[in-house]
């Protein structure tokens, strides 16, 4: 729940970068937020008090290497992945972003419309949650039925 609740502040800070990149690099625009979800899950597990106290945690993650290398920073430094895992996670995120992009385009929304904007935000939110879920699973967390 903590990582999900952070979506509003993460999403608001991500939006200018995501929108700027969408026309030229739509899979980057969609995929990078999945990496951010993964980072947030990792930070929740390791240092949530510091991460939660950072009102602009997305900007903090982005600014270390810049937007274009946010993925590499998260995979290398935040998650500490080796080259093999780095490649596997990058391929997974790329596949997810491409599938979401295909679904988004299939909707036939008018580019620049309010409806298209809302759909884009919904896609980002779901990819953020997917990143969070992937990382929690990688760390060994799993759902257990209670009762």
Locations of regions flagged by a protein language model:
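Intrinsic-disorder/low-complexity detector
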Residues: 1-147
């Amino acid at each position: 729940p903590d990582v999900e609740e952070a979506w509003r502040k993460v999403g608001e800070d991500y939006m200018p970068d995501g929108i700027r990149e969408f026309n030229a690099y739509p899979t980057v625009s969609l995929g990078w937020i999945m990496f951010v979800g993964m980072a947030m899950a990792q930070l929740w597990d390791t240092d949530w008090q510091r991460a939660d106290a950072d009102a602009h945690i997305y900007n903090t993650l982005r600014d270390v290497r810049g937007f274009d290398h946010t993925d590499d920073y998260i995979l290398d430094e935040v998650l500490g992945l080796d080259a093999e895992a780095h490649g596997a996670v990058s391929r997974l995120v790329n596949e997810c972003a491409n599938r979401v992009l295909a679904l988004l385009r299939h909707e036939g929304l008018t580019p620049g419309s309010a409806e298209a904007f809302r759909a884009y935000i919904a896609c980002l939110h779901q990819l953020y949650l997917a990143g969070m879920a992937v990382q929690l699973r990688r760390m060994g967390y799993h759902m257990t039925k209670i009762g």
